[in-house]
């Protein structure tokens, strides 16, 4: 059996990790051992935050809708309930956009929700 020298493989693996760690602070971008830990941790954060992003955007949309709804004299929960009763199927993302960029249309939706509740 011929001897297998693994220097080339190790070099490639190290280069790959150091390339991923490019831009990190201090030893995290230069020392393989530290860079490897940093890259693993970054991956864990990325995995976690891809899930959190969905929650955070929903929270943001709800906060925006609530603020706009209260300017029109109705709470968020009553507004959403009114829209459901009026069978208006617009999701929170679009409602938040309407609340920010088209106040007239949002006011019309609020009136529709209030009418459905009454």
From Swiss-Prot:
Keywords: Ribonucleoprotein, Ribosomal protein, RNA-binding, rRNA-binding. GO terms for cellular component: cytoplasm; cytosol; cytosolic large ribosomal subunit. The keyword Ribonucleoprotein applies. GO terms for molecular function: large ribosomal subunit rRNA binding; mRNA binding; mRNA regulatory element binding translation repressor activity; structural constituent of ribosome. GO terms for biological process: cytoplasmic translation; ribosomal large subunit assembly. InterPro entries: Ribosomal_bL20 (IPR005813), RIBOSOMAL_L20_CS (IPR049946), Ribosomal_protein_bL20_C (IPR035566). The keyword rRNA-binding applies. SUPFAM superfamilies: Ribosomal protein L20. HAMAP family: Ribosomal_bL20 (MF_00382). Belongs to the bacterial ribosomal protein bL20 family. NCBIfam families: rplT_bact. Part of the 50S ribosomal subunit. Contacts L21. One of the primary rRNA binding proteins, it binds close to the 5'-end of the 23S rRNA. It is important during the early stages of 50S assembly. This is Large ribosomal subunit protein bL20.
